[in-house]
Amino acid sequence: MNTFKFIVISSLLALLCCILTSCNNICGNKLLKQITTSDNKYTAIAFIRDAGATTAFSPQVSLFKVGHNLTDSDTGNIFIGNNSDFIDIEWKNENTLIIKHKCPKEEIHKKETKLKNINIEYIKLDDNN
């Protein structure tokens, strides 16, 4: 009887471990562009977040202090859109970031105009650009 209990408990623990390890974050980020301010303080990162077959691509932009590397757990702290795989960024000057996107207004979930001492401007492109 003790052998049977051991086998059952061991099997249940193995199954639980398999379930827990398969519940990893299924989202991934694809880096599109990374640009640094001329004073080398901040890095703007444009990326596409993909959370699997049942979700749309999400163009996102984050601003970090120089030295941060994009991870799959990062989400946009400046801009988050939906249903597009296009996003572009450029520095207008040391304190102004320009974000170009193709997201319709109703598909924009985050759109900051200032973060830290960085002003953020947006250019909405149509699908033909």
PLM regions with names:
Residues 10-18:
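Bacterial N-terminal signal peptides
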